[in-house]
C-alpha cells in the first residue's frame, strides 16, 4: 500500500516536471507576415520566490500593455510596471514587432497564466552578439534594477545570465531585412547608460564590439565624425553620463587649468556632456577669453556656470586683474592706461581699444583708464619766461645781465651744490654775477642730472627726503640759504625719484616719490610768503610715474616740464633706437596730453624749450636721416659744450655758416631741423622755439623755461669772481649783436613807431618772416593741386588776355584809322575802307575775306584776285561783287564769316615788323596805359579767334600779343628744392633773431620778399582763375593789365603800416614780379629797393636819423643824386639795376 502511494506520487511528480519545463508542444505554429522566419532555441530563466495571485494579475496586465506596444511598427525597448511588478521587453531593430507579439510574447504570457510569477522570470536571445537581432522579456517582482540591468545587457547583444532555474524553448522569430529595419531610438528609462571612454587610435565599434549603427542610436547627440580620445560613449540605451561640474559654493565657476596641447574639445570630453558652446558661454566674462580657437596654456577655464575666476597673475604685471598680490586690480599712476596684459602706459599699445571676437574683458585692448589726454584751447592770460643760467667757465661763460632773447621773468641759477649732510655749498654762488641781476626774479636751482645720477652724489636727494629728521634739516638749510641771499624762491631738480634704471647707480626705492611729496609739503610750509617753490619734472612717463604729481601740483607754485632730451645717444642698443630729434613735436604734444590725463593744471607748468641740438655719429655716412642707425659715442663736439652728442645753438650756427656743413633739411616726422656735418655726424634741433612757445601759450601753460641761456651766441665773458664787482654797464649800442626784439614790443604787438633803428628793422624782419612763412604754405598748397592750378591759370590768362587784346584791336584797327570793313545791309558786298597810310607806316596789312554762306552753297574754289580786278561769285544765278582798292592783294578762302544779315565779323591779317616794334610799344602805351615789350608781340602761323566786346575777331597769320610773355606762370621754375631753400632762409632769420645784427638778418630775407610776390601772384591766379573758370561764360568784365599787379594786396599788407604811396607800391610790385618771372634777381639791388621803400618811414619816425644815415646803415647809397629823385624815379632807378643772378641770391 505504501509502495503504491509512493509510486503514484513519483509518477505525478515526473509528469509535473514535464508540464513545467517542456513547452515546445504548447507553442503555436509561427506566423511571420512575409518576414524571415528563423527557428531559434530561446533561453528561459527564473529565480524562485513565493508566487501570489496579485503578482500574477499585475504581470498579465503588463503583458497587455506590451501587446499594445508591439502593435506599432517601431520601437526596440519597452518598459512598464504595475504595482510591485516591473517589466521590460527588448525587441531588436531587425526583429519584427507583430511576429514577436504573436510568436514570442505568448511564451512568457502562458508561463505566467499557468504557473504564476516567481521573483524573476525572463526569456532572451542574444542575436549572436548583435543587439539589432537580439530580444528578451523580463518580469521582476522585487526591484526595477533587475529589469534595467537586463535592458542594458540586451541592448549590447549580451545575455542576462542570472537565474536559479532555466530551460529552453524552440520557437520561431520573425526578422526584418536590413533594408526595412526599425530605426534605433535611445530609451532613457534605464537612467545613465553603460559607457566606455574612447581610446586614441580606435573606433567606437572596434573598442566596444557593438556595431556603429547601434552606438549612434544610443548617442544621438554625438557627432561620430568629430570624436576625440577620452570621449565617453554609451554602449547601451540610457542617458549619457554627466560629468559637468556645478559652480562653487561662492557662486564662482568651476575652473580647469589648461595644459600644453589641450583644446576645448579635449577638455569638454572630460566633462561630458560639456559642449564647445557651453565653454564659450561660460567664459564670456572670463578675463582674457579669446575663444576656443586661441586657448592659452595655464588659462583658468570655466567649465561650469558662475562668476569668472581671478585670472592667473603675471608676476611682472602692474595693473588690472593680471597684477599679482596686492597689485590686483590696481590703477596705473598718472591715470595712465592699463593694457589688456596688465601694464601701464600712454601709447596706443596701452590706450586703444580694439575689436574682439569674444567681447570678454582683457581681449579688446585697453582694460582701464583708456584713451588719451587732451590739450587745452584756453590761452594763457599771463605768460612768463624762465631761463636757466649756467655758472660756467670758458666759452660757456656768459654775463647773466646780458642774456639774448630776453627779457626773462625768472632766472634759475644752475646749479647750487648740496653736501652729504644736507647743508648747502655756497662757495661759488656767493661770488656769482648772478646775484647782481636785477631785471628778473632770481631763483637758485638745486640738483640737476649730474648731481642726481653721479655715483658720488646720487644718495643725497634720496636720503634727504627719507626720514622726518633729514627732511627737516634739509628744508631748514634751503630756507636759510634763500634768505641769506635774498632770493625769490627755491627750485629743485631731482632726476628722478624712484628711477629704477639709471646707469652706474642702484635703482631707487619706489617710496622715494611719496617721500619727495612729504618733503615738498614741509618745505613749502616753512617758506615765507611771496617766495616760490618749483620743481623740474620729466616728460617721460617712465620717470614721471614715480611722482605723485597730482598732489605735488597742489603743493608747489610751478613745475618746469622738461620737454627736451626725449631722444639721444643714451638710447644706443635699445629697441627702436635710431637717429632722431630730441624735441619731436608730436611726442611733446603727447607728453602734454599725459599731464592732462594725470589731472595736472597747465597753468602751473612751464613748457621746456631748448636752444641746443642732440648729435649722432652715423653708422653709415650715406644714411644720416631720421631713422638711420648711430654709434655709441655721439656726434662730433665743438669747444663750447665740448661734449660728444650735444651742440649749443651757437655751435650749430657756426657749423651752419661754415664749410663743415654737408647738408641741412627740415624733417617732417619731428618738425625739427637736421644738419649733417663733418662728413660723419648729424645734429637736430627744434625747427622753431617760437612755434613751441606759441603752442605752450595756446595750451594755457604758465610760460616757457629755456635750457640754457649760455648756449646762445654771446660775447666772450670771463666768469671771474674778482672781476664781478664792477656794476658799470656799457652804454646802449644800437648795432649791438644783442639787440633785443622784446624791447621793441608794446602790449599791442609790434611797435613801428619806436625810434630805435633796430626796432623798426626788427619789426620789418618779423613781418617778412610771418608773411614769408604764409607764402611758403600758400605755394605748397597750390603745388599740391597743380593740375587745377594750371586750369585756373589758363582761364585767368584768357580773361586778362582778352581784355588786353580788346585794347590792342581798337588801337590797331579802329581808333587809329586802319582798314575797317563790314558786310552791307544785304550781306552781298564786302566793303573795304582804306586807312590813312600816314598814321602807321610801320604796319603792313593784308586782308582776306569770306562769306560763310558761300560755303553753304558749295563754293569751294580758292581764287586769288589781282589789282583792280572785280570777280563775280554766282549765287543762285546772282552775281556777288567783291571790290578791291589801293592795289592791295585780296585772298578768298574758306573762313568763319556768318550768313547775310550778320554785321560783326572782322578778319585781320596785320604784321608789325621788328623795326617798328618800339614805336608800336610807345603808341600802344600812350593809347592804353599798358606797357609792352618786344617779346610781347608774336606772329601766329594759325588763325586765332577772339570774342571781344560783342564782336568776333579772327587774326590770320597776324602779329598779336603773346599771352605767355604778358602773363607768365610764376610757378614754372618753382620746385620743392627752391621752396626748401626759402624755408631755410626764413628759419635762419628766425633763429638769428637776437643773435645777429638786424642788418645781416635783413639781407638774408631779400629773396624771401621776392618769393612773397610770387606767392601773391600764384594765390591770385589760383583764387581768381578758379572763379573765372567756374563762371567763364558769364564773365564779360574788362580787366586791368597784368596779373602782376595782384601782388599789391600782399605788399600792402607787408608795408601798409609804413604808409608808402600806392603808385610806388605798384611799381615795386612790377619790379619784384619781373624778377620772380625770370627767376633772377640781383640781391643787392633788391636790398636797395627795399631800403628805398623804408626811407620815408625812417625819415618820419627817427629824429636821430637822416636819409643819408639810413642809407649808410644798410649800404645802399649807390647814386649821388638819389635823394633828388622822387619816389617813382627811385623805383625806376632800382628797376634799372636788376641783374641776372639767381633769385635766391646763392
UniProtKB/Swiss-Prot annotation:
It comes from the Eukaryota. Residues 1-17 form the signal peptide. SMART domains: ChtBD1 (SM00270), Glyco_18 (SM00636), LysM (SM00257). Keywords: Carbohydrate metabolism, Chitin degradation, Chitin-binding, Cleavage on pair of basic residues, Disulfide bond, Glycoprotein, Glycosidase, Hydrolase, Plasmid, Polysaccharide degradation, Repeat, Signal, Toxin. The active site is at residue 495. Pfam families: Chitin_bind_1, Glyco_hydro_18, LysM. Residues 18-29 form a propeptide. Residues 205-234, 254-303 form the LysM domain. It catalyses: Random endo-hydrolysis of N-acetyl-beta-D-glucosaminide (1->4)-beta-linkages in chitin and chitodextrins. GO terms for molecular function: chitin binding; endochitinase activity; toxin activity. Disulfide bonds join 319-338, 332-344, 337-351, 366-370. Its EC number is 3.2.1.14. Residues 316-372 form the Chitin-binding type-1 domain. Residues 383-735 form the GH18 domain. RF2 is potentially split by membrane-bound basic amino acid-specific peptidase to yield the alpha and beta subunits. Transmembrane segments: none annotated. Coiled coil: none annotated. It is an enzyme of class 3 (hydrolase). SUPFAM superfamilies: (Trans)glycosidases, Chitinase insertion domain, LysM domain, Plant lectins/antimicrobial peptides. InterPro entries: Chitin-bd_1 (IPR001002), Chitin-binding_1_CS (IPR018371), Chitinase_II/V-like_cat (IPR011583), Chitinase_insertion_sf (IPR029070), Endochitinase-like_sf (IPR036861), Glyco_hydro18_cat (IPR001223), Glyco_hydro_18_chit_AS (IPR001579), Glycoside_hydrolase_SF (IPR017853). One of its GO terms (biological process) is polysaccharide catabolic process. Chitin binds at residues 424, 447-450, 496, 562-565, 707. The killer toxin is composed of three subunits: alpha, beta and gamma. The alpha subunit is a potent exochitinase. Along with the beta subunit it plays a role in the initial interaction of the toxin with sensitive cells and allow the gamma subunit (the active toxin) to gain entry into the cell. Belongs to the glycosyl hydrolase 18 family. This is Killer toxin subunits alpha/beta.
